[in-house]
Each structure stands twice: as C-alpha cells, then as structure tokens.
Amino acid sequence: MAELTISSDEIRSAIANYTSSYSAEASREEVGVVISAADGIAQVSGLPSVMANELLEFPGGVIGVAQNLDTDSVGVVVLGNYELLKEGDQVRRTGDVLSIPVGEKFLGRVINPLGQPIDGLGEIVAEEDRVLELQAPSVLERQPVEEPMATGIKAIDAMTPIGRGQRQLIIGDRKTGKTAVCVDTILNQKANWETGDKTKQVRCIYVAIGQKGSTIAALRKTLEEQGALEYTTIVAAPASDAAGFKWLAPFAGAALAQHWMYQGNHVLVIYDDLTKQAEAYRAISLLLRRPPGREAYPGDVFYLHSRLLERAAKLSDDLGAGSITALPIIETKANDVSAFIPTNVISITDGQVFLESDLFNRGVRPAINVGISVSRVGGAAQTKGMKKVAGSLRLDLAAYRDLEAFATFASDLDAASKAQLERGQRLVQLLIQSENAPQAVEYQIISLWLAGEGAFDNVPVDDVRRFETELHEYLGSNAPQVYEQIAGGAVLSDESKETLLQATEQFKGTFQTTDGTRIINEPEVDALDAGQVRKDQLTVSRKVGK
C-alpha cells in the first residue's frame, strides 16, 4: 500500500490563492415582488432604481416593460402571457432598455415586435441590436425631399406625389382600399430592386397592427407570389396579441428601418394602422391609471405618433443620404377626418391621400378623393416628365366633379360643358387601376399626356381601360424608344409626341369596342354658305299618315 504524503507547501499555496481572490464586497441585485397581475399589466413593488422602458424579467421567461415609475411601485406592461404570473413572484431588472435585433437577414421574414421570427423558417442571424425608442434625426442631419417614391398608382403619382423621406398619410373608412394602395406601392419597387443599384433599391417594412392572422398570411402570400417578399419584412402584431405588442410594433418597424437608413439605404415603412396602435395605447394607459383626456386617450397620444413619424427622413449626404418614407394608415368612421386621432396624424404628416367609401362603391378604385388629398412636397418629388403632364389633371378633375353635380339638375348643357363632362368621365376611368397591378412611371406619363391631347375623347367610356392596356402593348412594339426616353428622366420631345399621336391613330383603326364597332375619326366638314346650296336640287320628303 502506497504511503500517503502531504505537502505543506502545496496546502499553503492553495490557501493563499483562495484568500487573495476573495472579495469582502457583497454583490447587489434589485429584486421586486409582483403585487398584482391582470389585463396585461403587472404592479411590482421594490426596484427603486428601475429605468423607464427598462426590460424586467418575470419567472418562466416572461418579460415586461417598466412604464409607471411611482414612489412605492412600478407599473409594468407584460409582453407575454400575464396569466402565468401570480402575487409574490420575484421580478428582476435586466439593465437593458427595450431593443430588437436588426440586420440584412430580416428581409423576407415575418417577425413579432420583439424581433423574433414567427414564420417557422428558423432563427435569424442579427447584425446588432437597436433601441426601439431611438431619437429622430435632427434638422441639420436632414436634407429636402426631392427624390420621387413612385407608387405605381396614377392618381397618387400625378396629383399627390410622394418623395423619399416623406410621411404621407393614407386615410379612409374601413374597406376602402387603404392596404391595397400600400401593397401596390411595395410591388412597384420590384423593378428598382432588380437593378441591384443601392441608390434605386427600396427595402420595405410592413407593420401589421391588430389585424387578423389570416389577413397577414394572405398579404405575405401575395408578396411572395408577386416576387416582392425578398425585399420586404413583415412586423406582425395580430389582433390576438396583447395590447403591449400592438403598441410596440410600429417602433420595432421604425428601429429596423433606421438601421438600414443609416447604412445609406432607402426604406419604405407602412404602419397598418395607427388607429389600432392608439387604441392599444389607450387601453394600456387606462389600465395603468393614467388620467384620460379627449375620447379617453391619454394626454401624450400626440407624442406617441409624432416621435414615431419624425423618424422618417431623408438624411444628409454626410450621413449616407439614406431615407425612410412612412405611409401611416388611419381608419376613420363615417368619413370623419375631424376626429382626434385623424387630426393629430394629419398635422404630423406631409400630406394625406383620402379614400372615400362612396367612390369605392361606385367602382372608382383606388377611391381617392382628389379634392381633399394633398401632398405638401408636391412637384419637388416628381420627375420632369410627370410634372409636365400632371399640371392640369387635378384642375380638370375638380372641374368635372363640379360639372357632374350641376349636370344632374340641368337639362341642357352647352357643347363645351358636354365635352368637358365626357373627357372627365374618361379621365376617371383612366385613373382606375386593378389591385396588385402598379404601373411604371413612363406608362403613366404617356397615358396622361394622350388623355390631355384628347386621344381618348372618342373612345367609349366603358372601353377606356382596355383601350389603354392594348394601346401600351401596341406602342411598346412600335415606339419603344419613347418609353426608354421617359424612363431615363427626360420629358416628351416634339418628335416623341408626334410619334405617339400617329401610332395612337393607327391603333384606333384596329381597336374593336365592346359593341363590336371600330373607332372611326370622321373628317371635319365645313358648313356650306347660302350661295352654295342648290335649292332646285333639294328633295323634300313628306311623311304621309295612314
């Protein structure tokens, strides 16, 4: 049996190492206790050093955001299943302010407001974390909005143009096509994305707030089928989620957008819709016992939307010249744009596109009321070619609306009024577009210019849209150089105008209307003078009664 030897030097060395690493200082950890938990809100006692918007950790991995910082308790918005919490549970500080992971890999994915994937396609590799409540760019960090953000919708691109870095409100009653306008705008960015040019490409973020899960799934399917999902991220806070997720979803979309903007990219963010976010924030505020104001909204609901939408900007060249274009959606009731939330957001944004249920029900889609829709950026965000042809369009349509109202009471109209009425009817038809069918700017310019020149005046009203579609197919084969010229940013030259008019007249000879006839331009005949009439050759026919 081996002899046991003990080295006193080794024992002394081990004790010395242990005692030298020992610290007499006690570690401090703040721990709170749940007083109550109900309706997505937890009241927590303790945590005297907690920060506003700090993440707190509950048992079972549930997290919350500190909101009300009272002297003896903290009001916490629970981001998860609050039913798992019970009185007496311990709550720990994390020291982190609410943030989400961001990065290029988020394109093509569906995430929740915490940046976690919910599409079943696996984890997302993030580049970094970005704070949700980030400060908007200052005045000196911005530059004027001058680059167009084409939507592919003639009525918007011509009369209420949107520029990169602008905030344009889409407002209207439910079921008037608000989401369709925004989805078409996303689809219209496909051609720019395929160029591979960073200065042309637009990354899109669609924030779905309080919508049905089936609606979000259908939208994702549409984007995927149209080839637009590869440059789009969907931030989803469906109706089944807690109010806290609906409140945070727009800020998550804005944080992801700012990450790309500061890299010099162009981003389009759609908030669908901010009415539901305001309602969720109202519910949270009332549950936190904050004093209600107008329509029971809290006093800082204006600040809720202003600090979100101010993050949309066109950055200066020194910061990379990136941009965020915001399209917030607001749902009205009975076309009442004077309600609290609509007036708030109208005052924050750079213009609004108003969709009207009456127009929608009459088949005018997109149902844009051009009378009260406006863009405060205006022609600065239009190409030269579009600015040239769209100048009189709004006036022509406004005059048509007035004349249309008058014509319902007047029995006789003079020839000029009749001509204006008929052209207005054709302009309205020309501005109607199918869903998920955005139109390139060069096609819009050619259609609007030809309409202004009277090329559609003798086309039956019911055939205007089909005539336009088939005309573009014909012009694409017979005058492709005109499309290339406009796409390059040039205005229509006199030679191009002549080419378009001649080609249109040739096409009219082949176009067949719905009733099977052809469009024939009858030559103008001058009236005969009295001396030219041969009275002796006139034949008088008399109708003889039976």
From Swiss-Prot:
- Catalytic reaction annotation: ATP + H2O + 4 H(+)(in) = ADP + phosphate + 5 H(+)(out)
- As recorded in UniProt, its EC number(s) are 7.1.2.2
- Output the NCBIfam families linked to this UniProt entry: atpA, PRK13343.1
The opening ranks of the lineage are: Bacteria, Bacillati, Actinomycetota, Actinomycetes, Mycobacteriales
Protein name, as recorded: ATP synthase subunit alpha
Gene Ontology CC terms: plasma membrane; proton-transporting ATP synthase complex
Q: In UniProt terms, what function does this protein have?
A: Produces ATP from ADP in the presence of a proton gradient across the membrane. The alpha chain is a regulatory subunit.
Oligomer status and interactors: F-type ATPases have 2 components, CF(1) - the catalytic core - and CF(0) - the membrane proton channel. CF(1) has five subunits: alpha(3), beta(3), gamma(1), delta(1), epsilon(1). CF(0) has three main subunits: a(1), b(2) and c(9-12). The alpha and beta chains form an alternating ring which encloses part of the gamma chain. CF(1) is attached to CF(0) by a central stalk formed by the gamma and epsilon chains, while a peripheral stalk is formed by the delta and b chains.
Topology in the lipid bilayer = Peripheral membrane protein
Q: Tell me the compartments it is located in.
A: Cell membrane
Q: What are the entry keywords?
A: ATP synthesis, ATP-binding, Cell membrane, CF(1), Hydrogen ion transport, Ion transport, Membrane, Nucleotide-binding, Translocase, Transport
Respond yes or no to whether keyword Hydrolase is given for this record.
no
Q: Which organism is it from?
A: Corynebacterium efficiens (strain DSM 44549 / YS-314 / AJ 12310 / JCM 11189 / NBRC 100395)
The cross-references to HAMAP family, in alphabetical order and at most eight, read: ATP_synth_alpha_bact (MF_01346)
- Binding-site residues, ATP: G172, D173, R174, K175, T176, G177, K178, T179
Q: Which GO terms describe its molecular function?
A: ADP binding; ATP binding; proton-transporting ATP synthase activity, rotational mechanism
- PROSITE patterns recorded for this chain? ATPASE_ALPHA_BETA (PS00152)
**Similarity annotation:** Belongs to the ATPase alpha/beta chains family.
> At the top level of its lineage, which domain of life is listed?
Bacteria
* Residues marked Required for activity (site): S373
Spell out the Pfam families in the cross-references: ATP-synt_ab, ATP-synt_ab_C, ATP-synt_ab_N
